[in-house]
Amino acid sequence: MVTRTFTAVLHKEEDLYVAECPEIGTVSQGKSVDEAIANLKEATELCLEEFPIPDIHPTLMTTFEVAFSA
């Protein structure tokens, strides 16, 4: 069994949190952040059981500034 660390990107939609794993492409949701991450972990594990792990490159996350008219 192989253990890997993946990225979870979360955002809130109305009364749910949506969680996405950009490296694998899995998405799930939950009523709390913890539930969304747990559901994403389960979805990702199921996906990796069925499909070979893709060639994964580390995700680089940063911030940037944008000027716009408000």
Where are these regions (language model features)?
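Short, surface-exposed helix/turn micro-motifs that flank interaction/cofactor sites
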Residues: 20, 37-38
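Short, charged, surface-exposed hinge/linker loops at domain edges
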Residues: 1-5, 9, 38-70
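Short histidine-centered beta-strand/loop micro-motifs
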Residues: 19, 29-30, 56
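Intrinsically disordered, low-complexity segments enriched in polar/charged small residues
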Residues: 16-17, 34, 46
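Short aromatic-glycine-(Arg/Gly/Cys) micro-motifs in beta-strand/loop hairpins
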Residues: 4, 9-23
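A short, exposed loop/beta-hairpin motif centered on an aromatic-Gly-Thr core
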Residues: 24-33
